[in-house]
Structures are given as C-alpha cells and as structure tokens.
Design a protein with these regions (language model features):
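Generic detector of well-ordered alpha-helical packing
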Residues: 238, 250-251, 329, 424, ...
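Hydrophobic packing positions in regular secondary-structure scaffolds
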Residues: 1-270
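Extended alpha-helical regions
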Residues: 154-157, 435, 439
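Alpha-helical transmembrane segments and their membrane-interface boundaries
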Residues: 259-408, 412-435, 443-454
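Generic intrinsically disordered, low-complexity segments enriched for polar/acidic and small residues
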Residues: 50, 441-442
Length: 454
C-alpha cells in the first residue's frame, strides 16, 4: 500500500502546477508515514517544498521535517514564513531542534532561535554546551520523571498530564528532590499494577539503573543499546543528577554514521554525512583526492624495489608474470585480516591487550591458508603453465610468506593505531595493500636470488 501511495504522490507532484488538486494530495499524504513522505520531499525542487509541506497533516509536519537531510531542511526553511517556522520548531523534540541548529548556517540559526519559544531556546542552548559526539550532544531532555513516594495512580496521572510532550514514556525515571537518578520503572509495570492506589513507586522501581555520563562518547552509547537492548538510556552529570536520555532512534543514527565513516576510511575516502547525490563534484573530489594522492606516492616504493632487482628479472623474465598474482593475494589476505580485526574492535570483542593472541591466531590461519594456496598454485604452474619446478617453488614459497606477512601486518596495524589514538579504520585495505605490495616484492626477489642463484 505504501509503495503505491508514494508512486501516486510522485505522479501528482509532477503535474502539480497543472492539476492544483490539493485535496487529492492531502488524501494521499494522509496514508503515508513520515519517513516515506520525507523521501518524497528529498526528490522535490526547492520551490515546491513549501507547497507540499503546507499540505502535510499537522500532526506529522515536525516528524517529516526531522527526517529530512540538512540541505533539504534549509531549502524548506527558506520558503516558510516566520509563523510556519515557529510552529515547526515548537513541535520538534528538543534533540532534533538542537541537531537542526548545529547543521544550519549562522543566518538560518538566528532565524530559528528567534522563532523558538523561550523554554525551547533555553533547552537548545543547554544541549549545545556538550560536545557533538558525546551522550550530552545527542540526548533529549524531554523525559518522564517520577518521585519515589508517589503511588502508581499519581504516577499515571502525571504521565497522562505531561507524557504527550515527552519523547518516550516507555520507561519513566525516578529521581529524588535533587534530581539524582535512583531508579527506573516501565510503563508496563505501572499499567499492570494490582493496587495502583497504594503501591508506591519506590517499591516497584528497578534501582539497578544503567546510565551514561554526559561526556560518554556517542559510539560507546550506541554499543550499550546493542548490549542491553534498551529503548532509552538515561544520561547523568558528574553529580549523578538526571539531565536527559538517549533514545533508540538516535542510537541507530549514530550506528549508521559510524558505519558510514568507517567504510569511507577503510576505502581511503574522507567521510561525509551527505547522501551521494547531495554532494557536489568538488566535495566528492575533496573526499577522495588526498588519500589517492598519498597512496600513489607511497606506491613508488614498489617501483623502487622492482628497479633494484632489474637484473634478476632480466635473467628469469617469467618471474614478472606472477608479480600481480602475488601482490593481489597478499593485499587480499591483509585486507581480510584487517577488516576482521577492525570489526571486532568496533563491537568490543577485541581489545588492544589482545595483540599477542591476535598475532598467534592470524599466524596459524595464515599457515593453513598459505599452504592451501601454494599447493593449488604449484599444481597449476607445473601442469597447466608448464613452468620449471625451481621457478614454481619460488612463486609458491613467496605466496606462503606473503600470506603470513600480510595477515600479521593486517592484524597488527589496527591495534597499533588504537593504542596511538588513531582511528583503526584508517589502517584498512588501501594502506595495507600498499605496505604488502612492497613487502611481497622484497620477499619474492630475495627468494628468487637464493633458489635460482641469480
């Protein structure tokens, strides 16, 4: 149903200037959830954004706005009146409003804050004090607080009165008079209470609360969601006072951003939080060029090695034919090892102190892999390629050594990077491949000199 409605809406928007069937548009839009409507907005030219936004169901307008990319949000803001902008900002959850302020240029931020009501403006300024990549920077202050001496009936009355403006009421947080976090109670427990008029919150709350500090790194926060399976995690200050919560939707966004950043770094690109088609040619060039330039310069070491062994290649020219196979095998082996280690470090399975165990494990795997590849390759060289056994031995011994060295290097570099406070993702495929290429050539030519006496 959703896909059909989206297609219908796109068709109607293509002929909007001619049809002017606004009521029909409203009817179609009322059947779609906010994320689907936001996807339609992303495809519209800037001049049509305000028209469509004014037709949105009022209860979905802020939610749709929060789903848009910063570029589309700015285009939409430029087309809204101050009154319309105020309605949107006031309906946004405070963490979404803070994200909006962080993403917009100064002139747009000034306009947003001017339209926000004083309470919202105060909460936004409070959240902006925290680092962007910390729990304080991604939390919301719109949460449900209860007191330990309340009865369940009093708590339910408070939720009915104030819960509509809270980001979530699935879990309610119990605080004392100083706002110190002392417990958590679920809405389920409150609803299912058998004696709501007499049962106290302190008697049913869970006082073993998992919380994070305002300075906790956002990646660590997202890992806690994965570990505990929570829908929200409370955030406390240095004095253990409750200041906000991080919700699961923000945790998912953090995971997506961190994964995108790691993928970009693992492929020698600068990370970008913009969709592909929202990036200009210059941005794409800027994200890719520095690493490609560095890798091109670093690959000259391989050229220097080859020039240094020109005599060996001239004596046994067939050695040249197997250089690509050896360097590719080494690069692939190193990349597999690196990717496995980086992934393990990202999810907390691997710590820097595990380095000796990592190297021993990778060495044993490399022996098995290298031996298997060498046996298969030796049979191919002798029976299919008709290569002399001494040359085949050189190639296969190099293959074993290359796989071992590559996997050891691939296991070593991410851990070393972590210890030196570098991002382990930087030590990924392109850089590993460059290092392994040079190492492979040195091993290859030296084995050839020894076995072939050249």
């Amino acid at each position: 149903m959703s896909d059909t409605a989206i297609l219908t809406l796109r068709t109607m928007l293509a002929n909007l200037d001619d049809a002017k069937k606004y009521q029909s548009l409203r009817d179609v839009m009322s059947t779609l959830p906010a994320p689907d409507l936001a996807a339609v907005f992303e495809d519209l030219p800037p001049e049509k954004l305000p028209v469509l936004f004014r037709l949105c169901p009022k209860d979905l307008a802020a939610e749709i706005f929060a789903e848009l990319t910063p570029e589309t949000q700015q285009d939409l803001i430029d087309g809204l009146t101050d009154k319309e902008l105020k309605a949107v900002v006031d309906d946004l959850f405070v963490d979404d409003a803070t994200d909006l302020v962080e993403e917009m240029p100064a002139n747009v931020v000034k306009r947003i804050l001017a339209q926000a009501d004083p309470a919202t403006r105060r909460m936004i300024n409070e959240l902006l004090k925290y680092p962007e990549d910390s729990a304080g920077g991604v939390m919301t202050t719109e949460l449900m607080e209860l007191r330990p001496d309340w009865t369940v009936s009093q708590a339910m009355a408070a939720i009915r009165k104030n819960g509509f403006d809270k980001e979530t009421i699935n879990n309610c947080y119990v605080t004392d008079r100083d706002r110190t976090l002392i417990g958590v109670v679920s809405l389920r427990a409150l609803v299912l209470s058998k004696d709501p008029d007499n049962e106290l919150i302190r008697d049913m709350m869970d006082d073993n609360v998992v919380s994070v500090s305002t300075t906790t790194d956002q990646e660590d926060v997202s890992q806690m969601f994965e570990k505990y399976g929570y829908l929200a995690i409370p955030v406390v200050d240095n004095e253990k006072r409750l200041v906000g919560i991080v919700t699961i939707d923000d945790a998912i966004s953090i995971m997506q951003d961190e994964a995108s950043e790691d993928i970009a770094k693992m492929n020698a690109m600068g990370p970008s939080d913009k969709p592909y088609f929202k990036q200009s040619m210059w941005e794409l060039y800027k994200n890719r060029a520095p690493w490609l330039l560095f890798l091109m310069i670093s690959s000259t070491f391989s050229s220097m090695v080859i020039r240094g062994y020109e005599d060996a290649l001239a004596a046994v020219t067939v050695l040249t034919a197997y250089i690509p196979m050896l360097t590719d095998a080494g690069g692939n082996a190193g990349s597999q090892s690196t990717s496995t280690i980086i992934r393990g470090m990202a999810v907390g399975d691997i710590e820097p102190h595990d380095l000796p165990k990592i190297l021993w494990r990778e060495f044993r795997i490399a022996i098995l892999w290298g031996g298997t590849l060498a046996l298969c390759n030796f049979a191919k060289l002798i029976f299919l390629d008709g290569i002399a056994p001494p040359v085949a031995a050189v190639v296969c011994l190099t293959l074993i050594c290359t796989v071992i060295l590559s996997q050891l290097i691939g296991g070593l570099l991410p851990v070393v990077a972590e210890k030196l406070n570098f991002d382990p993702a930087v030590m990924a495929s392109p850089l590993i491949t460059t290092i392994v290429d040079t190492t492979t050539l040195l091993v290859y030519f030296n084995i050839a000199r020894v076995l072939l006496r050249i």
